[in-house]
């Protein structure tokens, strides 16, 4: 939020809305860290928005000349929503990295491609094939989700008190400074931009849960082994711990994501309660999604596939090979273009996971 307030002042000075001296002073104060973040959050909950106590802190550091130009023509939701988009950029950067690690592990598993497997439909043995088939069905949806991440938009929120942009001079300056999409129409009660981002994350989590569930089943049947956890009661047990962790985190994700995706509509020009609930959800969405991808990635890193005692018809082997070849080529292209999202803080992964 401090970053947004500082960028707002700088952009308004660039556009001639406030004096440059005030903007420089505000921006300098906004580079400071709040001395008590926990107290800020507590006061923000009491005040109804964390922006109010944050502005009190910034005002205490400003000269009388700079005070009138702080938070000029903005409303609290502008600051919170824009800060949330900056946070979501960081979340996507972490998730893209974790997804890339998983895709790389799967791509490396092409070494098992020709191993015979027994396919299963409705969990029952079906037809012999090769691991190329299963590899394709694991990897292709992940690549789809990664491409959806690349197309995601993180819009600026700047609508003023009631979302009519009254008195504001619109320019691209603020959006460009924050590397956000310059959406002209405010979205105070149109939460589709937030829903869209959460649903993209949901695609990754659903993919991870599907693969983790498959790994648990294959570990049970002895068709795959991976890093195992022990048991306090049964020394012979070797539990597929990483896959289990991924399933648990995915279940938790869907619970907190529903706060966004199943929210009641936001009323009129500014919502009462539904918007505030997002503050609880977004950090938990980031934590549970990254935990899911991290866990399934660790499972894939240690995964060994075992050959089934079946004879694969040549035609089925060829069909599976063709599917895998196209998917692996696509994976190598996507991994080759993998790059971090534009953002200032690349250390966020440790804070999220």
Feature locations, PLM:
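Catalytic-core signal marking the mid-to-C-terminal active-site face
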Residues: 20-24, 33, 44-46, 51-53, ...
């Amino acid at each position: 939020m401090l970053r947004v307030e500082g960028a707002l002042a700088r952009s308004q000075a660039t556009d001639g809305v406030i004096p440059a001296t005030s903007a420089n002073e505000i921006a300098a104060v906004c580079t400071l860290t709040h001395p008590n973040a926990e107290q800020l959050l507590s006061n923000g909950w009491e005040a109804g928005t964390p922006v109010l106590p944050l502005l009190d802190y910034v005002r205490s550091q400003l000269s009388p000349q700079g005070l009138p130009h702080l938070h000029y023509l903005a409303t609290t939701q502008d600051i919170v929503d824009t800060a949330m988009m900056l946070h979501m950029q960081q979340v996507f950067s972490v998730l893209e990295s974790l997804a890339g690690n998983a895709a790389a592990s799967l791509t490396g598993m092409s070494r098992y491609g020709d191993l015979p497997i027994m396919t299963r439909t409705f969990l029952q043995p079906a037809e012999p094939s090769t691991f190329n088939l299963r590899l394709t069905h694991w990897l292709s949806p992940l690549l789809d989700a990664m491409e959806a991440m690349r197309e995601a938009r993180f819009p600026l929120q700047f609508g003023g008190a009631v979302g009519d942009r009254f008195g504001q001079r619109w320019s691209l300056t603020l959006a460009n400074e924050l590397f956000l999409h310059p959406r002209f129409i405010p979205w105070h009660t149109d939460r589709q931009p937030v829903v869209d981002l959460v649903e993209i994350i949901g695609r990754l989590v659903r993919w991870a849960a599907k693969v983790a569930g498959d790994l648990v089943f294959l570990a049970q049947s002895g068709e795959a082994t991976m890093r195992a956890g022990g048991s306090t009661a049964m020394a012979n047990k070797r539990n597929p711990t990483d896959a289990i962790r991924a399933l648990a985190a995915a279940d938790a994700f869907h619970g907190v994501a529903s706060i966004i995706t199943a929210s009641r509509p936001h009323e009129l020009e500014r919502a009462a309660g539904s918007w505030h609930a997002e503050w609880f959800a977004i950090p938990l969405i980031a934590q549970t999604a990254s935990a899911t991808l991290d866990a399934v990635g660790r499972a894939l890193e240690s995964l060994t596939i075992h050959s089934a005692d079946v004879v694969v018809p040549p035609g089925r082997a060829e069909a599976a090979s063709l599917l895998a070849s196209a998917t692996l080529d696509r994976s190598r292209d996507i991994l080759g273009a993998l790059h971090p999202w534009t953002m200032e803080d690349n250390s966020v992964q440790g804070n999220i996971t």
